[in-house]
Amino acid sequence: YTISGCLLNEALQSKEEFTPEMQKEIDDWFDQQPDFLPQTDSLSQRTNVVVILCESLESWVLERKVEGKELTPHINQLLKDSTTLYAPHVLTQVKGGRSIDCQLLLNAGMLPIANGCYAVLYPNNNFYTLTKAVTEGNERNATLLTVDKEVTWNQGMVAKAFGIGTIFSKDSWVLDEKVGSRKKLGDVSFMKQSVEKIKKNVVRMSPNNNYLQFVTYSGHNPFKLPEALQQIHFKGDYPERMRDYMTMAHYTDKAIGIIVDYLKSRPDYENTLVVIT
């Protein structure tokens, strides 16, 4: 249980030999699965992609009312849209890299390694990513917006490997809403400032082949939102952690509403695919 012991154990575990038997087990599993084909009749071609990675946002708060109040009214409204594809029955597949593993899953379509973190061990890999496909190799058209430092989970190097040319990180924002134990920028202010940067063309959003990726923070454990930022309250005797999570989810939902409403106001919205996960 020492630091050196943990590192040694991780190194030993990560060098497990991949055997022909393991390959056969994988192949047999795929052979037993039904083919899933794209629903081409319900999908129209979009050349702009906006991805919103929400920290610890779980599906149980969606489409749910507590004491007559919607926990996520803005997302709920999106779910009613006939063009929305909703996949609620998805289990977490991240490993030791947590949120940075999510970026690997979504952007590169790859599962994270079982031990350790790919972002630290393999940041210089040549990844075939959604970003590169959307921007057709033009990194100027791909932007990452995060309230973290670039060194957090080695985000800076990973973004470059994924084909993201521009990063707006911690020092790019005015810290006017402090949220969480680490007092980072709250989601609502993050989205408000992001919209202003897009309007002023500080954040580049070209009409075509554009990729924007937002990474939120406020939903990070322990889900403590300052009272001044709380816009939903409950009278019932709920477990403290549950109450805190519902309050935080409502706050993050408001932030999502801000950026989505802005995107809808743009003339290129019909050409934009918005992914919230």
What is each residue range found by the language model?
Residues 1-13, 77:
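Transmembrane and membrane-interface helices of multi-pass
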Residues 19-20:
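Fold-level signal for large, globular catalytic cores of enzyme and receptor domains
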